[in-house]
Regions:
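Thiamine diphosphate
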Residues: 1-146
Length: 146
């Protein structure tokens, strides 16, 4: 049986991010949005539709996305990049350190799906602390929540 959720009337964090990004994009033409094949998961749809020339779909290539964002920032753009928390904290640490932090580039990094409650977008995005590698790992944890 599917878990029932109570509608509190509050916006979800990723919905707030998408709405805020869209509003900021209307005010500042330097803003560029980039994602690693997660436009729907991060609610970037409205920005991509309204500003297609300022939206970059990078595919499943978070490291390349961070490098491209740093390059855009050097040219005066303000890139907002988005991916799952597991990937922007673990998979791209070197790129963030070398290309964003050391260079003091103006790159904004947003992430979502930090816990284990958004299983509908895939359990592969769960943090390593929520996995075990002998069996099904994250999938086992997800099923226990249902």
């Amino acid at each position: 049986m599917a878990k029932k959720y109570i509608d509190t009337g509050k916006k979800d964090t990723r919905g707030g991010f998408g709405a805020g990004l869209y509003e900021a994009g209307k005010k500042d033409p330097r803003i560029v949005a980039m994602t690693a094949d997660l436009i729907g998961s991060l609610k970037m749809d409205a920005f991509a539709k309204e500003f297609p020339d300022r939206f970059v779909q990078c595919g499943i290539a978070e490291a390349n996305m961070i490098g491209a964002a740093a390059g855009l920032a050097v040219t005066g753009k303000i890139p907002f990049v988005g991916s799952f928390a597991e990937f922007v904290t673990g998979r791209v640490y070197d790129q963030i350190r070398q290309e964003v932090a050391y260079g003091h580039t103006n790159v904004k990094i947003a992430s979502s799906h930090a816990g284990i409650t958004l299983g509908e977008d895939g359990v592969f995005a769960f943090a390593d602390c929520c996995r075990h590698y002998e069996g099904q790992g994250s999938f086992d944890l997800f099923l226990r929540q249902v």
